[in-house]
Curated annotation (Swiss-Prot):
It comes from Vibrio campbellii (strain ATCC BAA-1116). Anthranilate 2 binds at residue 169. The keyword Kinase does not apply. This is Anthranilate phosphoribosyltransferase. It catalyses: N-(5-phospho-beta-D-ribosyl)anthranilate + diphosphate = 5-phospho-alpha-D-ribose 1-diphosphate + anthranilate.
Amino acid sequence: MEAIINPIITKLYEQESLTQEESQQLFDIIIRGELDPILMASALTALKIKGETPDEIAGAAKALLANANPFPRPDYDFADIVGTGGDGHNTINISTTAAFVAAACGLKVAKHGNRSVSSKSGSSDLLDSFGINLAMSAEDTRKAVDEIGVAFLFAPQYHGGVRHAMPVRQTMKTRTIFNILGPLINPARPNIELMGVYSEELVRPIAETMLQMSMKRAAVVHGSGLDEVAIHGETTVAEIKDGKITEYTLTPADFGLEPHPLEAIKGGVPEENKAIITNILTGKGTDAQLGAVAVNVALLMRLFGHEDLKANTQQAVEAMNSGEAYQLVQQLAAHA
């Protein structure tokens, strides 16, 4: 192992970027629990200070996917809608809520998530409060995607090896490459993804990373401080289509909506969030809350080939108003 790891660590000390293969080798050793914690901290720090390249991120993601527990991958188009978290704004659980609304609009979603990073209640905390089984088997999860159109893959169940990095990450108390890997390592391996990132500087590099992860169609977004499509300002988008990246900006008007202040979509602790999300999914939320979810669903629908954002937004709002989106929450809770 030293023959593999020493040249990689030396390269990082010299602030040289790793090839995708070298990054994959490094993270393979980390995930198998074979790297000394001091060396791991050194490598993660060197990567952070240098700035992780798309090759390094893709290599790390491929190592984690190669070591993940298996999932029976659907042979149809299906998506993940996910944010890195860590934007520090504690909004309502937009992407989790949007997953149910997207399914009510006819899309297939296999959402990968974990406990909270930035909101007081992460997606798994919220699903837990609705009685959705986070420990559902891979087979049952796949069946839920087939039959209900939406299911949730809880990261620790598939990525046990990440625990080897936890003590180092907790001691370092700073963002590392692991903070951006979560959305790239969905064990179901979706071919469509809407991914929000906590910094505008990450939009292009993450899109370049996704290009190497053989996505059919994807978009990376940062919305005026949020790791989501914004309803309070502009959203920077890098979209992957036909193997090319197109960058553009979206505003609430592009979705046919009025802007709303960021304060209007603040979240709470899990119990409060449960009430807020129930209201949204039954059409009883505020215009800001419904809009915040609808714009994210609308962009995800575009990735499935429904290009008209305004029509998509209306369809998403209707799926909430009709209560159809909330029925899927109940179906998923009853599924296991």
